[in-house]
């Protein structure tokens, strides 16, 4: 997609890097939950599920599904951390892919 063309998932996913968008969001999540102030049981389980996302035969959800199905929790995490870049990446993921 060019900078002047708005991606519209309702027309086509062509040209939208949903896996890349999810990876950006998930990398920010992993970095934040590694900090003691954001770590908790939910994120511990989330990280286990994220590790399983790479195992095609064993996974229940891939990275995109995992990110899209937890947007509310991820948004809460980014807001608590003041992570504006994370929030922008999450918005893009939601708008283009989820």
UniProtKB/Swiss-Prot annotation:
Q: Which UniProt keywords apply?
A: Nitrogen fixation
Per the record, a Pfam family?
A: CowN
Alphabetical list of InterPro entries matching this protein: CowN
Q: Where are the transmembrane segments?
A: none
Q: Does the keyword Magnesium apply?
A: no
Q: Name one GO biological process term.
A: nitrogen fixation
Q: Which family does it belong to?
A: Belongs to the CowN family.
So what does this one do? Answer: Is required to sustain N(2)-dependent growth in the presence of low levels of carbon monoxide (CO). Probably acts by protecting the N(2) fixation ability of the nitrogenase complex, which is inactivated in the presence of CO.
Q: Can you name this protein?
A: N(2)-fixation sustaining protein CowN
Source organism of the structure? Paramagnetospirillum magneticum (strain ATCC 700264 / AMB-1) (Magnetospirillum magneticum)
